[in-house]
Curated annotation (Swiss-Prot):
Protein name: Putative 2,3-dihydroxypropane-1-sulfonate exporter
Protein family according to the UniProt entry: Belongs to the sodium:galactoside symporter (TC 2.A.2) family.
Subcellular location: Cell inner membrane
Name of the gene: yihP
Task of the protein: Could be involved in the export of 2,3-dihydroxypropane-1-sulfonate (DHPS).
Origin species: Escherichia coli (strain K12)
Lineage start: Bacteria, Pseudomonadati, Pseudomonadota, Gammaproteobacteria, Enterobacterales
Entry's transmembrane regions: 21-41, 48-68, 93-113, 124-144, 163-183, 189-209, 244-264, 277-297, 309-329, 331-351, 388-408, 420-440
One term under GO cellular component: plasma membrane
Length: 461
């Protein structure tokens, strides 16, 4: 059985306050995540004194570990049948957010060990952080099918989520370094101070999300009691759900491209453009363009459909990066072309969450088993693998191109940074265009038919 409202699930409209609360949840998640994505590699190389390859290995091991903790979270969520008044997903948002906050701060604490000891300690802390972040963030993301079955409202929630994520990224991009610099003469304490302040705000925002969202469609009994969630079942759910599998491949590419860009832009502005403060100012413009894209996304989807808007966003992204590589030699041109690329990425990153929610019903339609947690965390498994590779690749490449911290870089190092921030993301975006254009088949018409057939089955069961 399910907890179901009396309103038609296909037409139910969500209140503004609930959409805002859901968007605030990804504001919280991205504050807690992006301080690490943006600055942790630089903290490892420039403060802890670790070689770039070691920093990359920390990301590789930790993110691969959390890929499996994501899957474990999905299995745990789909195994829950005794659902209390807090719901199926919301309790994990509430209780996991506190250890995530503490560990996000601890990641920026130095240790008095040698290089090996520092590497081991940093890896352990980052793995623990990833474990609790999986519990919090996977529950947050998997909750959408329990909130609404209206495809337009799901697209709206995806837009609000991306808006919150973009605001979190903007705050971390613009504010972290100035806050860190308030502690003069001690870079280590500056990192700790900034991480503490940002993480506490992340905790507060996540609690606001918890209090403002409502679960309406929660399965309390399995459709097939003999079929219990497990790791093998999770991978089968992905392999047997073609739209989900294609979406996983697309995210493997796009998230890897986006995270490499974020990691390298700190080095690019400092060593290529010789303007380290530019990153803070650029954030206002580039993230502003993302907000415009997020704002335009729901109307664009209603007119053209999710798939066409997704591919269109990728094409804009590629155009912006290629223009930056060939013509973006100065600060002004770098900001302008980056804004174009980030504008395109807004459609891609927003629609990922709406598309994965649609694959829940596709999987239920194909198998008779509704597994929000398994589908969502199978999706995030690929995203974490992408993050693992995106964390390792820049650190490894920094060593390969001859990066030396806190000095002027050689010409071949400069060219390596340019290729990392522009050519690598463009190539992955092109691969994604081919994958989504040729192999993704779940459109709006098919989705409506699937939902109608599922509801008909339930009425006759």
């Amino acid at each position: 059985m399910s907890h179901i409202t009396t309103e038609d699930p296909a037409t139910l409209r969500l209140p503004f306050k609930e959409k805002l609360s859901y968007g605030i949840g990804d504001l919280a998640s991205n504050i807690l995540l992006d301080i690490g994505t943006l600055y942790l590699l630089k903290f490892y190389t420039d403060v802890l004194g670790l070689p770039g390859t070691y920093g990359g290995i920390i990301f590789l091991i930790s993110k691969f570990f959390t890929a499996f903790t994501d899957m474990g979270t999905g299995i745990m969520l789909d195994s829950r049948r005794k659902i209390g008044p807090k719901g199926k997903f919301r309790p994990f948002i509430l209780y996991a957010s506190f250890p995530v906050t503490l560990l996000a701060i601890a990641n920026f604490v130095g240790t008095p060990f040698d290089v090996t000891g520092k590497t081991v300690m940093a890896t352990i802390l980052f793995m623990l952080y990833g474990l609790f972040f999986s519990m919090m963030n996977c529950s947050y993301g998997a909750m959408v099918p329990a909130i609404t079955k209206n495809p337009n409202e799901r697209a709206s929630l995806a837009a609000w989520r991306q808006g919150g994520a973009t605001l979190g990224l903007l705050l971390c991009t613009v504010g972290f370094v100035p806050v860190m610099n308030l502690i003069e003469g001690n870079q280590q304490l500056g990192y700790i101070f900034a991480a503490t302040l940002f993480s506490l705000f992340g905790l507060l925002f996540m609690w606001i999300c918890y209090s403002g969202v409502k679960e309406r469609y929660v399965e309390t009994q399995p459709a097939n009691p003999a079929q219990k969630p497990g790791l093998l079942q999770s991978f089968r759910a992905i392999a047997g759900n073609r739209p989900l599998f294609i979406l996983c491949i697309a995210n493997l590419c796009t998230l890897g491209a986006f995270n490499v860009k974020l990691a390298i832009q700190v080095y690019y502005t400092q060593y290529v453009l010789n303007d380290p403060i530019l990153l803070s100012y650029m954030g206002f413009f580039s993230m502003g363009c993302i907000f415009i894209g997020v704002f335009l996304m729901p109307a664009s989807v209603r007119r053209f459909g999710k798939k066409k808007v997704y591919i269109g966003g990728l094409l804009i992204w590629v155009l912006g990066d290629l223009l930056n590589y060939f013509f973006g030699g100065g600060s002004v041109s770098f900001v302008a072309f980056s804004c174009l690329a980030f504008f395109g990425s807004a459609f891609v990153n927003s629609l990922n969450w709406a598309l994965v929610s649609d694959t829940v019903e596709y999987g239920e339609w194909r198998t008779g088993v509704r597994s929000e947690g398994t589908v969502y965390t199978g999706f995030t498994f690929f995203r974490k693998v992408s993050q693992a590779l995106a964390g390792f690749f820049p650190g490894w490449m920094l060593t390969q191109i001859g990066y030396v911290p806190n000095v002027a870089q050689a010409d071949h190092t400069i060219e390596g940074l340019r290729q990392l921030i522009f050519i690598y993301p463009s190539a992955l975006a092109v691969v994604t265009i081919v994958a989504m254009g040729c192999f993704y088949s779940l459109n709006e018409k098919m989705y409506v038919r699937i939902v109608e057939e599922i509801e008909a089955r339930k009425r006759t069961a």
